[in-house]
Amino acid sequence: MQRRAPPSDEAPGGLRAFVTTRRAGLGALVVLVAAALGGWALRGRFAPDLRADPDMILWPDAVSVTGIAPWVGGDLKDVALRDASLDGGLPLDDPELPQRLARAFGMHPWVRDVVRVALRHPAAAEVELRCREPVAMVAVPGGLLAVDAEGVVLPSEDFTAESAAAYPRVSGIQSSPVGVAGSPWGDPVVHEAAAVAAAVGPEWRDLGFRDLRLAEHAARRGWELVDAAGRVIHFGAAPGGEGEGEPNVAAKVTRLRALAADPDRPEWSDLTVPP
């Protein structure tokens, strides 16, 4: 009987040949895997110590905020951080921390823009804001709602009866806001009224106006300013909506300033036609 020869260690494709020819590569791979596992082990060992470092934990009292307007009531910083669940210790090494802080402050109804968020070490943060400015109070059943120049509803609970009286009162509005404070009212009529109130600005107080209302018998939608004595100034269209031949908002405001200086101004004035 013919005896079968034992398998040769040098047979091509054999395990020993593979190991022999790949020995250098396998050695390098083992070193890389060991280094990676060692890195993860070190990270797991020392990461808790990094987070335990008080200089790496950001607390609310180390967050400074600039740009908060004087008409903003309450503690804007505390409310913004609390509502975003960021009122605990925050790891300074979180790469998304600046964005999280920006989102938290940007969600506050008084905040128009988050201008800048800067982190510092030891753990501190600087946040710069631009706040919305109230320009009018819209009369609704049960009270007044503040709006800015773009018709965004503001937190009316921050106003007293006395402070609310310093702003134009928009009357005759039939709608209600479509969202919460910090959202646009959602009615073009309210947005127009807010634009008129913003354009009139300081002249409102100088002229002693009481109400801003829709013109009752105008051929096209326009606005009237009414003072405490019942005298009316027809302002006309909101800024940007002027008809053909109607003066622009700058010309109207110039006329308003002249009327403010005239103690004997008439019962009715019309800013949509030349004086």
Question: What is each PLM-predicted segment?
Answer:
Residues 1-64, 82-275:
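Charged, solvent-exposed interaction patches on well-folded alpha/beta domains
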Residues 70-80:
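Membrane-proximal extracytoplasmic alpha-helices
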